Amino acid sequence: MTALLSVKQRERLGDERQSQAIAALRDVLPEHALIWNAEDTTPYECDGLTAYRTRPLAVALPETEAQVAAVLKSCHALGVPVVARGAGTGLSGGAMPHPMGVTLSLAKFNRILKIDPVSRTAVVQCGVRNLAISEAAAPFGLYYAPDPSSQIACTIGGNVAENS
């Protein structure tokens, strides 16, 4: 049997969960890497599919792999869902936040680690823009452009996540 909650009960539950999540994330992230007020989280309410919007409890903006792991561990301990997000340019709702969850922005992971023209491969972090990959590969006569119209903004992590 599913229990139905009143709007006030749901809001109260959301407020409590948000407070718990923020307290836990403050322990593992620098102050500038965590946002939760409505004004600052508005850009994270949707991806390129703007017809549907949901505000997350908070947005984590980690800068290191250790911080990503700490965010995931903290959220798991609280039972808080996490939605990973790159540039948010997708049109399928793949980066749609969970209203009782945390959005994990991976945009700061934007380094190109290696371009190997012989094997025609690139080792990049998930937040690298498609255009940056093409620019790094251009001196070798190579490019990466599965979707040239959005390559200035979309990221390789989003390409992989959305099977672009």
Where are the language model's segments positioned?
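Short glycine-biased active-site loop of nucleotidyltransferases that positions the nucleotide triphosphate
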Residues: 48-51, 93-98
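Beta-rich nucleic-acid/ligand-interaction surfaces
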Residues: 153-155
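Short clusters of hydrophobic/aromatic residues that line enzyme substrate/ligand-binding pockets
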Residues: 34, 41-44, 91, 112, ...
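N-terminal glycine-rich flavin-associated loop
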Residues: 25, 51-82, 100, 106-148, ...
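N-terminal accessory segments
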Residues: 1-48, 77-80
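Conserved PLP cofactor-binding pocket of PLP-dependent enzymes
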Residues: 85
